[in-house]
C-alpha cells in the first residue's frame, strides 16, 4: 500500500457509503474504482454526483435481488459494482438535450451518466431514461459542494453533489414491504362505486354515438318521430289552452312510439334484427344492470322537454277565472305577489315546537341549505324529470337529516313548517308546474316508493297551506311577515322613534309576562339575523340599548350567545367588531362576561365563522378589548388562511395605532401562555410566513427577538423561499431591518433552497425597480453593506472591496459579477474580464504569495452546462472572490482593487498589450537596481536565508496539509454526526405511537442538515495552503537560480584559469599587439591578486597573450563573455527576487497569523450562530414532545 493509500485509509469513514467510496477510498487505484476516479480527477467540473440518502444505502436492498434468497444491500454495491457507481455520476459539462418552456420557464435537460445512461432533469425532479431497467421519478432534495480531502483528487477541488431521495436503480425495504397489507374490501368497494358512476353517466345518445350499427337501425325513425312535421303529435307544438291530462297522454304516446322503434329493430321481419339484437346484448354485458327503457325515456324527454315545458307554463299562467271547473290541476297559487307578501316570514312564526336557541339555529341552517338546493329548480340547465326529482329529494333530505346527538324530533309538522320557509324564500316561479312535471313525466315509477310519496305529500300540504283554500292561515302568515318587515325596516333605517314606539307597545302588552316565541321581537330573517343583529349592523347604539339594557329580560343569555348569522356563522360580537361599532362591542362583551359561565365565555369568544375566524381575529377593530378578553381568546386558532388572531393583528398595516396594537396583543399572549409554552410555529400561514415575516414594524414592542423564552427562527424561509431579512429588504421595512440585524442568530448570507438567492440578490432586484422610496432605499443600502463590512471583512486600515451577487446576461451569454467598495463605489465585470484582471494582478506581482489565477477558477468551469445549479456555482465563485479580496486586504489592497472598479475604458486594449506593459514595468524595476555585483559570500548568505526559510515553510506546509484534511473531513463528519443523531431521534419519535405526523415531520432528513461551519473554515486553510505553495514556488525558483549562478560561477573560474595560463605564456608584443581583456570587455582592469576575491570583475584582469594562441584565446573569451552576461543577469534577478521574496516571507508570516485568526473568528461566529439556532430547534422539538405526551395522556 502506498503512503497515499495509508493516509487515506486512516481518515474517518463517512456515514454515506457512496460518498465514502469515492472520496475516502484506500483502493482508489484498483477496480472497480480506478477508471471512475481517474475521469473525475482529470476534470471534476464536468461531473455531478447524484447521492442517495445514507439510510437508504444502509438499510435497503438492490431491487434486482428482491425475489432472490441472497439479497444485496445497496451499500455493498457502492464498493463492488462499477456500473452502480458510474450510473450515479452524470456529465454536466455537456448536455444531451436542453429545452425551456417560454411561459412557465420550466427547463428540462437530459444528461448522460458515466455509464452511458440518460437522466432527465425537470422541475426539481430527476427521471430515469435510456439505459435504466426501471423508469423512476425522484425528487432532488438539495445540492452542494463537497470539498475533497483525499490525495488522488486535485488539491482544493470541490465536487457538485445532488442529494436525491432514492437510488437511481430503485430500492426496496423488506420490512416496509411486509407491512403493506392490501385493502381488498376497500378496493372492491371503490371499484363498485366507480362502475356505478360510469353506468349512471351512460345515455341513449352516447350509445348511438358509440355503436354506429345501433344508430343506423333506429336513428332515422327517431328523427321522424321528433320532427316538427310529424302531425301525429302536433298537440305538443301548438300553444292553445288544453288540459294537463292531454299533455301527459300525448307525451306517453310518443314514449310508447319510441319503445316500439326499439322493439321493431329486433323483430324477425327486420333484416338487421339479429345484428341489432346482438349489439343490445353486448351493451348489456358491458354495463350489467343498465335500464334501457329509462335511457329511451330520457332520450325522448331530452328531445321534447322544451315543448312540454312551454305547454305547462302556458296552461299554468293562463288566467285562473274558470280553472277550478275546467282543470283544477292547472291552478297557480304561488304568484310573485304571494311571494312578496311572505318575504319577511320568520321560522318562529310557523308553530314549530322548538324553542331552544341552538335548535333554532340548526333549523335555520337547514333551511338556508335547503333553499340553496331548492333554488336549482329555476336553473335553465335542469331539463328532465330525473334532475328535478333529485333536487326535491335532496331538499327534503337536507331538512330531515339530523346530526348525531340531536335532541329534537323531526316530525311531519316540523317538516311542513320548514318546507314553507324553503318555498316562500326560494321564490320558485311556476313551482306547481315543476311538481306536476315530476309526478307525470318521470322515467321511474314511484308509486311503490314510500319515501318519495311522503315527500310529495308534504309538498302538497305546503301548497295547500299557502293556497287561498285556507285564507285564515295564509292571512296570519302575511300579517307576521308585514310586522317583521315594519320592525326590521325601522331598525335598518335608523328610525329610533318608530322603533321606540313599537318596543314601548311590546313593553305595555307584556308587562310581567313572557314574550311569545312567535312574536316579531323574536323573529329572525332567513340568514338567522335577529333585531339585535340589525341594530348592530345599523351601528345604532340607541336601538341596541333599548333592546338589551332597557329591557334585559326580553332576551336570555342563551339567546344572545346563539344569536348569529347562519350564513357567515358570525356572532353578535364578531359583527360589532367587523362593522366597527366599538360602543356596542364593548357593551356586548361586558354583558356576556357578566352573565355567562367561564366555559360559555371560552366557547363563545372562540367559536369560528365560515372563514374560520373567531372574535380574536376581529379584535384589531377594537384593541382596547384585548386586555379584557386576552385570557379567553385562543391565540393559536387558525382561520382558513392559517392566520391566527395574533397573525391577523400583525397584518393590520393600515391601523392608526399599530404600535399599541402590537404591544397589547403580544402582552396578552405572553401573559396567557408564558415561558417557552408559546409555540410560534402555530402562527405560520399557508404561505409559510412567520410572525417575523408579516410584522410591519415595532419588533421591540412585540419582544419577538428580545424575549429569551421565545423559540423563534429568524432565518425561516416561507414557501416563496424568503427569509424575514430578504422580505424586509424587498418591501423596504427599514425599522424591522435595523432590529433584525442586531440579532446574533441571523444568518445574513443565507441562500434560499430553490433559487440560491441571498440578501444581495433581493437588494439588486429592488434597485432595478422604477419607483423606489429614495431615502428609505439609501438607508437600507447603507445598513446591509455596513453590516457586511463590519461582520464579514477584517478590520484593516484600507479600502475594502467585496463582490455582491451575479446576474446572467442573455445577450452576452455571460455572468456579470457586481462589486462594491467600502466607499460606496460599485461596478460589475464579466467572468471573462475577471479572469484577465486576476491574471494581470498576478503578472504584475511575481514572486509573491498571491494565488495563481487557476486556483480562483479551480471549481468553476466557464463552459460548464449546469442549469439547475449554475447560480449555486456562481455564488461559490463569489465566495472565492471575496476570499481573494480578503487576502489582498492584508497587502494593502487599494492598488489591486482599482482594477475591479475601473470603467470600460480599458476594454478596447488587448490582453497582449497588458502583458507587454506588465513586462515593461518589471524590466523597469530591475533596471532601477543599476549594475548589480554579487559576491559568492553574498550568494551564500542569500542561499542560507532561503534554505532556512524554506525548511520552516515546509514544516508549516506539512502541518497545514494535515489541518486542511482534518477541516475538510470535519465538515462532513459534523453533518454525519447530526444526521445519525436526528435519525435516532426520528426512530424514537416513530416508535412512540402517540406522536403526530406533524411532530414527526419536524425531524429533518439528511439532505436538510448540511449546516456544518467547517467548510467555511476549510476555505481559509486552503487559501493559506495555496498562498504558501506560491511562496514556496518563488523561493524554489530563486534557489534554482542560485544553483545556476554557482554553476556559471564555477565555469567562469575554470575559463579564467585557462585564460590566465595562456596570458602567462604569451610573449610581449612591442608594437602594441598584445592580447588584452581590457580591449575585449572595455571594463577597468582588475589585478591578478584580486581574482581570488571572488568578484565578477576579477574575471577581466588579462595579461599578455602570445600571438600564436590568439584563436584559442578568442574562443574562450567569447564563451566566458556569454557566461558573464548570464551571471550578470542572474545577479539582477537574484537580488530583485530575493528582496521581493524576503519581503513576502516576512509579510506571509504576519499574513498567516492574521488571516487564520480571521478565519477562526469567522468560524467561531458561524458555529456559535449554528449552535444557537440548532438549540432553538431542539428545544422546540422537546417542547412539542412534552406537550404531545400530555395531550396523549389526557
UniProtKB/Swiss-Prot annotation:
Pfam family of the protein (one): VPS9
Disulfide cross-links: none
Residue ranges occupied by any VPS9 domain in the UniProt entry: 324-475
GO biological process, one term: early endosome to late endosome transport
GO MF: guanyl-nucleotide exchange factor activity; SNARE binding
Transmembrane regions: none
GO cellular component terms, A-Z: early endosome; late endosome; plasma membrane; transport vesicle; tubular endosome
InterPro entries: Ankyrin_rpt-contain_sf, UPF0507/Ank_repeat_27, VPS9, VPS9_dom_sf
Similarity field: Belongs to the UPF0507 family.
PANTHER family reported in the protein's UniProt record: ANKYRIN REPEAT DOMAIN-CONTAINING PROTEIN 27, DOMAIN PROTEIN, PUTATIVE (AFU_ORTHOLOGUE AFUA_1G09870)-RELATED
Identification of the protein by name: UPF0507 protein PICST_55861
Organism for this UniProt entry: Scheffersomyces stipitis (strain ATCC 58785 / CBS 6054 / NBRC 10063 / NRRL Y-11545)
Lineage summary: Eukaryota, Fungi, Dikarya, Ascomycota, Saccharomycotina
Amino acid at each position: 500500500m502506498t503512503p497515499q493509500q495509508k493516509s487515506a485509509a486512516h481518515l474517518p469513514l463517512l456515514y454515506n457509503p457512496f460518498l465514502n467510496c469515492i472520496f475516502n477510498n484506500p483502493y482508489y487505484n484498483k477496480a472497480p474504482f480506478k477508471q471512475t476516479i481517474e475521469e473525475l480527477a482529470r476534470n471534476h467540473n464536468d461531473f455531478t454526483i447524484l447521492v442517495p440518502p445514507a439510510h437508504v444505502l444502509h438499510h435497503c436492498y438492490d431491487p434486482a435481488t428482491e425475489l432472490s434468497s441472497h439479497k444485496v444491500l445497496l451499500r455493498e454495491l457502492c464498493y463492488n459494482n462499477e456500473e452502480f457507481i458510474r450510473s450515479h455520476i452524470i456529465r454536466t459539462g455537456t448536455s444531451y438535450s436542453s429545452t425551456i418552456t417560454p411561459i412557465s420557464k420550466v427547463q428540462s435537460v437530459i444528461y448522460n451518466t458515466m455509464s452511458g445512461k440518460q437522466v432527465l432533469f425537470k422541475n426539481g425532479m430527476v427521471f430515469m431514461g435510456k439505459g435504466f431497467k426501471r423508469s423512476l421519478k425522484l425528487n432532488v432534495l438539495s445540492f452542494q459542494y463537497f470539498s475533497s480531502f483525499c490525495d488522488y483528487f486535485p488539491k482544493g477541488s470541490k465536487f457538485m453533489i445532488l442529494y436525491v431521495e432514492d437510488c437511481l436503480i430503485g430500492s426496496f425495504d423488506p420490512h416496509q414491504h411486509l407491512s403493506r397489507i392490501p385493502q381488498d374490501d376497500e378496493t372492491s368497494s371503490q371499484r363498485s362505486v366507480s362502475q356505478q358512476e360510469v353506468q349512471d353517466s351512460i345515455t341513449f345518445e352516447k350509445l348511438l354515438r358509440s355503436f354506429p350499427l345501433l344508430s343506423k337501425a333506429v336513428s332515422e325513425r327517431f328523427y321522424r318521430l321528433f320532427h316538427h312535421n310529424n302531425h301525429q303529435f302536433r298537440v305538443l307544438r301548438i300553444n292553445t289552452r288544453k288540459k294537463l291530462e292531454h299533455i301527459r297522454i300525448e307525451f306517453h304516446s310518443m314514449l310508447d312510439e319510441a319503445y316500439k322503434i326499439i322493439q321493431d329493430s329486433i323483430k324477425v321481419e327486420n333484416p338487421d334484427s339479429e345484428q341489432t339484437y346482438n349489439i343490445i346484448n353486448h351493451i348489456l354485458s358491458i354495463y350489467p344492470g343498465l335500464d334501457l327503457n329509462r335511457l329511451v325515456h330520457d332520450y325522448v324527454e331530452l328531445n321534447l322537454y322544451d315543448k312540454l315545458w312551454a305547454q305547462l307554463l302556458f296552461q299554468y299562467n293562463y288566467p285562473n277565472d274558470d280553472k277550478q271547473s275546467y282543470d283544477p290541476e292547472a291552478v297557480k297559487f304561488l304568484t310573485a305577489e304571494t311571494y312578496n307578501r311572505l318575504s319577511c316570514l320568520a321560522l318562529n312564526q310557523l308553530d314549530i315546537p322548538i324553542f331552544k336557541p341552538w335548535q333554532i339555529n340548526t333549523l335555520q341552517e337547514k333551511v338556508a341549505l335547503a333553499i340553496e338546493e331548492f333554488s336549482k329548480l329555476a336553473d335553465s340547465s335542469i331539463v328532465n324529470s330525473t334532475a328535478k326529482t333529485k333536487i326535491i329529494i335532496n331538499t327534503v333530505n337536507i331538512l330531515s337529516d339530523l346530526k348525531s346527538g340531536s335532541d329534537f324530533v323531526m316530525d311531519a309538522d316540523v317538516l311542513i313548517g320548514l318546507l314553507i320557509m324553503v318555498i316562500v324564500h326560494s321564490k320558485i316561479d311556476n313551482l306547481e308546474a315543476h311538481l306536476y312535471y315530476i309526478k307525470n313525466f318521470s322515467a321511474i315509477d314511484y308509486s311503490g316508493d314510500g319515501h318519495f310519496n311522503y315527500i310529495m305529500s308534504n309538498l302538497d300540504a305546503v301548497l295547500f297551506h299557502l293556497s287561498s283554500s285556507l285564507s285564515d292561515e295564509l292571512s296570519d302568515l302575511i300579517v307576521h311577515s308585514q310586522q317583521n318587515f315594519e320592525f326590521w325596516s325601522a331598525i335598518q333605517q335608523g328610525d329610533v322613534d318608530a322603533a321606540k314606539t313599537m318596543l314601548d307597545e311590546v313593553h305595555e302588552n307584556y308587562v310581567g309576562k313572557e314574550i311569545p316565541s312567535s312574536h316579531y321581537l323574536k323573529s329572525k330573517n332567513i340568514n338567522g339575523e335577529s333585531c339585535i343583529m340589525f341594530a348592530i349592523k345599523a351601528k345604532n347604539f340607541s336601538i341596541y340599548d333599548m333592546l338589551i339594557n332597557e329591557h334585559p329580560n326580553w332576551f336570555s343569555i342563551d339567546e344572545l350567545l346563539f344569536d348569529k348569522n347562519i350564513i357567515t356563522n358570525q356572532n353578535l360580537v364578531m359583527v360589532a367588531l367587523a362593522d366597527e361599532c366599538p360602543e356596542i362591542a364593548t357593551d356586548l362583551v361586558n354583558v356576556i362576561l357578566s352573565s355567562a359561565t367561564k366555559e360559555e365565555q371560552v366557547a363563545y369568544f372562540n367559536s369560528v365563522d365560515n372563514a374560520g375566524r373567531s372574535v380574536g381575529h376581529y379584535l384589531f377593530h377594537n384593541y382596547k378589548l384585548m386586555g379584557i378578553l386576552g385570557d379567553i381568546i385562543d391565540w393559536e386558532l387558525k382561520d382558513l388562511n392559517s392566520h391566527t388572531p395574533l397573525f391577523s393583528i400583525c397584518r393590520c398595516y393600515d391601523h392608526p395605532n399599530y404600535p399599541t396594537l402590537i404591544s397589547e396583543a403580544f402582552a396578552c399572549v405572553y401573559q396567557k401562555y408564558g415561558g417557552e409554552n408559546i409555540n410560534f410555529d402555530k402562527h405560520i400561514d399557508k404561505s409559510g410566513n412567520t410572525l417575523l415575516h408579516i410584522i410591519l414594524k415595532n419588533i421591540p414592542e412585540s419582544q419577538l427577538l428580545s424575549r429569551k423564552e421565545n423559540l423563534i427562527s429568524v432565518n425561516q424561509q416561507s414557501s416563496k423561499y424568503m427569509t424575514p431579512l430578504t422580505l424586509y429588504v424587498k418591501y423596504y421595512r427599514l425599522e424591522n431591518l435595523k432590529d433584525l440585524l442586531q440579532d446574533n442568530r441571523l444568518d445574513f448570507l443565507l441562500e434560499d433552497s430553490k433559487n440560491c438567492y441571498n440578501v444581495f440578490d433581493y437588494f439588486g432586484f429592488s434597485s432595478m425597480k422604477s419607483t423606489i422610496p429614495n431615502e428609505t432605499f439609501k438607508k437600507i443600502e447603507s445598513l446591509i453593506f455596513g453590516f457586511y463590512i463590519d461582520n464579514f471583512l477584517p478590520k484593516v486600515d484600507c479600502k475594502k472591496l467585496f463582490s455582491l451577487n451575479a446576474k446572467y446576461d442573455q445577450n452576452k451569454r455571460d455572468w456579470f459579477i457586481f462589486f462594491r467598495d467600502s466607499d460606496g463605489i460599485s461596478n460589475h465585470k464579466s467572468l471573462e474580464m475577471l479572469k484577465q484582471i486576476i491574471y494581470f494582478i498576478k503578472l504584475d506581482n511575481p514572486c509573491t504569495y498571491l494565488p495563481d489565477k487557476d486556483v480562483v477558477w479551480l471549481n468553476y468551469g466557464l463552459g460548464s452546462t449546469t442549469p439547475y445549479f449554475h447560480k449555486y456555482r456562481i455564488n461559490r465563485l463569489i465566495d472565492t472572490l471575496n476570499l481573494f479580496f480578503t487576502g489582498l486586504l492584508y497587502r494593502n489592497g487599494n492598488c489591486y482593487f482599482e482594477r475591479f472598479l475601473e470603467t470600460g475604458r480599458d476594454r478596447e486594449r488587448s490582453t497582449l498589450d497588458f502583458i507587454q506593459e506588465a513586462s515593461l514595468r518589471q524590466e523597469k524595476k530591475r533596471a532601477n537596481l543599476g549594475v548589480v555585483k554579487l559576491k559568492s559570500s553574498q550568494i551564500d548568505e542569500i542561499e542560507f536565508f532561503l534554505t532556512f526559510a524554506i525548511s520552516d515553510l515546509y514544516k508549516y506546509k506539512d502541518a497545514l496539509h494535515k489541518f486542511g484534511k482534518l477541516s475538510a473531513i470535519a465538515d462532513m463528519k459534523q453533518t454525519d454526526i447530526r444526521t445519525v443523531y436526528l435519525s435516532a431521534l426520528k426512530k424514537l419519535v416513530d416508535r412512540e405511537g402517540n406522536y403526530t405526523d406533524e411532530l414527526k415531520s419536524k425531524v429533518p432528513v439528511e439532505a436538510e442538515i448540511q449546516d456544518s461551519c467547517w467548510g467555511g473554515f476549510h476555505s481559509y486553510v486552503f487559501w493559506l495552503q495555496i498562498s504558501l505553495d506560491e511562496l514556496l514556488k518563488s523561493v524554489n525558483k530563486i534557489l534554482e537560480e542560485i544553483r545556476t549562478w554557482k554553476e556559471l560561477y564555477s565555469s567562469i573560474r575554470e575559463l579564467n584559469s585557462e585564460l590566465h595560463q595562456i596570458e602567462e605564456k604569451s610573449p610581449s608584443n612591442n608594437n602594441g599587439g598584445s592580447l588584452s581583456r581590457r580591449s575585449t570587455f572595455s571594463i577597468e582592469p582588475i589585478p591578478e591578486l584580486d581574482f581570488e576575491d571572488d568578484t565578477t570583475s576579477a574575471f577581466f584582469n588579462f595579461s599578455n597573450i602570445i600571438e600564436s594562441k590568439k584563436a584559442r584565446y578568442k574562443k574562450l573569451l567569447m564563451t566566458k563573455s556569454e557566461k558573464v552576461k548570464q551571471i550578470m543577469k542572474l545577479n539582477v534577478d537574484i537580488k530583485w527576487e530575493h528582496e521581493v521574496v524576503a519581503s513576502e516571507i516576512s509579510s506571509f508570516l504576519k499574513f498567516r497569523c492574521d488571516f487564520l485568526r480571521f478565519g477562526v473568528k469567522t468560524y467561531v461566529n458561524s458555529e456559535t450562530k449554528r449552535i444557537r439556532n440548532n438549540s432553538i430547534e431542539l428545544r422546540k422539538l422537546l417542547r412539542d414532545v412534552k406537550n404531545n405526551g400530555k395531550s396523549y395522556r389526557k
